[in-house]
């Protein structure tokens, strides 16, 4: 039978519940347990797919095409279990399901209320999510409850967790509460009162936490931990200090050293083998002792909010570990390039244009792509980054000066990138796609396997085929592919059924490393294995740096 660990948060948001939950999962997995994670989001949106990256951060896409919270990305990076749609649900989904049942008459005319109908539905979603785990029936399901204790939106989820714990009985569920212990500079001390009040608020709901994870900018002294223990009624050894670390991959060892996994296993009456965190120690060692260093420019419009590119940043970090190369990411606002030109790119070892949407800043990105192509700087374009690379090539190499995407210019006669529903086939016929089409409307989501063209750089990187996740509405238009190929561009991968371009590259005779991908490879990168595309990209950046350095030395000589 699956046992549950509920992770809640108090005092303030953004303390790192997702990292804490994922780290605990990693430790338990290292002890031989099958583990899955779920994220409960209190907002009323059905999913984060249409939410602004400025408010919500990155939208993480699962293998089965669900648009989910970025914490699911942390889950997949920390454990081997893959996440699915059932691993993340929102208040919006819960109410939608309950209202649908009410309309069908499932409640037999009863008054539908938060208790028991909403809370029962939440429990059903939790159990369904745990049962759908890709690892088989999990020994432990860790459930992260979004929001902060005291928020009105979180109350039904906390009540459902309380009811579920009561229903399942002793040693079947436990609660871990993450709080803030702030350092007050004027007083010169850590303050435990916010944590005391947060636990008090949780106990008012009927939940007594078994473990407290106390976040601070420094290690919490034993006397302060004893004070928190006394006022919160949590054993002192279960008051765990979680201080700021320069890498999230140090957190599993930090929690294990303080006995978190032992406390959880004791509470749930689990007797797994001893933990083996050597993999995490090795990864941290690689991260902290690189042999090389490169600077990669990420050109985008969300550069002030790195949460928007969380998986991408982590994928580059994974490549850093596996190539012994420190990767410095320089965030460059594409609108600044439109105003001031490409001077800010000239010291870079590689250029990356990530996914995005909307017209703002696109001409700056295209200017950056042109610079990378002409200066022979390694370039990686992801999703929109590939589409803009095709547009730049069509304009500046093929000669279609007004080439564009219909996302930015509905009137352009040369629609080299177009919405799926207004897509052209190779004969120039418009292919209409609707909600009933195989692609499911105007968004392509989830994993898709595609064969790779032999003899290409893509084949060197991936092998015979590629299986990556998608999240986009626009596609490279097949009508223009013959002209692009005549100019030298290579379509190195296509979808097997719809014949849609998946990867593009330039031959080495034109450029040493220039690759665009329609999918999002960052979603499948893990610290355990890295990712072949990002490893190749970092290696190309290092090779470019070394060749440039050699040329500069030659000039001085």
From Swiss-Prot:
Keywords: ATP-binding, Glutamine amidotransferase, Ligase, Magnesium, Metal-binding, Nucleotide-binding, Pyrimidine biosynthesis
A Pfam family per the record: CTP_synth_N
Catalytic residues in the record: 383, 520, 522
KW Signal (keyword) present: no
GO CC terms in record: cytosol
Pathway: Pyrimidine metabolism; CTP biosynthesis via de novo pathway; CTP from UDP: step 2/2
CDD domains for the chain: CTPS_N, GATase1_CTP_Synthase
Residue ranges of the region described as Amidoligase domain: 1-270
Binding residues annotated for Mg(2+), in chain numbering: 71, 144
GO BP field: 'de novo' CTP biosynthetic process; pyrimidine nucleobase biosynthetic process
Residues holding ATP: 14-19, 71
EC id: 6.3.4.2
Broad enzyme group: ligase
Binding, L-glutamine: 356, 384-387, 407, 473
Assigned protein family: Belongs to the CTP synthase family.
Note: CTPSs have evolved a hybrid strategy for distinguishing between UTP and CTP. The overlapping regions of the product feedback inhibitory and substrate sites recognize a common feature in both compounds, the triphosphate moiety. To differentiate isosteric substrate and product pyrimidine rings, an additional pocket far from the expected kinase/ligase catalytic site, specifically recognizes the cytosine and ribose portions of the product inhibitor.
NCBIfam families cross-referenced by the UniProt entry: PRK05380.1, PyrG
Record's protein name: CTP synthase
Record lineage: Bacteria, Pseudomonadati, Pseudomonadota, Betaproteobacteria, Burkholderiales
Encoding gene, per UniProt annotation: pyrG
